[in-house]
A protein has these predicted regions:
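Acidic/polar residues at beta-strand termini and the immediately following turn/coil
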Residues: 28-30, 138-142
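Bacterial N-terminal signal peptides
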Residues: 7-16
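Active-site-proximal beta-strand/loop segments in catalytic clefts of secreted hydrolases
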Residues: 39-42, 68-76, 126-130, 140-143, ...
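An exposed tryptophan-centered "aromatic clamp" motif
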Residues: 51-62, 70-136
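Extracellular adhesion/carbohydrate-recognition regions
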Residues: 20-65, 156-160
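Positively charged n-region of N-terminal signal peptides that target proteins for export
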Residues: 1-4
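Short, P/G- and charge-enriched loop/turn segments at secondary-structure junctions
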Residues: 110-113, 143-148
């Protein structure tokens, strides 16, 4: 009788294990998977709307979208080493460099041939707040320029996960 009960338990647990494994796709932690960007940007919205939009977007079966950091936006820069990740523009959430003292108009001005890996024109919001005001850091998809903006300005947004 005990053998039958143990065998029955083993079958039930095996079934549960297989069911749980197939029920939902495993997701890698954010730091171990490549960034996934939303397919199309939302246009001309203020910062609070951009934050709300990214928290509520449902795309490709995912609901864990968010507003990107300035560092994540900088990974999209092409042909402008100053604004690209690790470039001389000092603005970086990763390095805790988000004040006006970290900003240098010369090194953050972008490049004539600077462009972004995603489509779009104009300024794009980040989730990175300038730590000494209520302004947020933004990046231009026209020339990879990095600047700051008041929350009431209307800019574009790509979401990331």
């Amino acid at each position: 009788m005990k053998k039958i009960a143990l065998l029955l338990l083993a079958v039930v647990f095996s079934f549960l294990f297989v069911f749980a494994e197939n029920a939902a796709p495993a997701q890698k932690p954010a730091e171990k998977r490549a960034l996934q960007w939303s397919k199309n940007p939302a246009t001309k919205i203020i910062w609070k709307e951009a934050e709300w939009y990214c928290k509520n977007i449902k795309e490709d079966g995912y609901t864990d979208w968010r507003l990107p950091t300035i560092d994540e936006l900088r990974t999209l820069v092409e042909n402008c080493p100053e604004s690209a990740t690790g470039g001389t523009c000092g603005i970086s959430e990763t390095n805790n460099k988000l004040t006006i003292n970290d900003y240098n108009k010369e090194t953050c001005r972008g490049c004539k041939k600077g462009r972004m890996k995603l489509k779009g024109k104009g300024w794009f919001w980040s989730s990175s707040q300038r730590t000494d005001t209520d302004h947020y850091w933004v990046i231009s998809f026209n020339n990879a320029r990095i600047s700051e903006a008041k929350m009431i300005m209307a800019y574009n947004v790509y979401c990331v996960r």
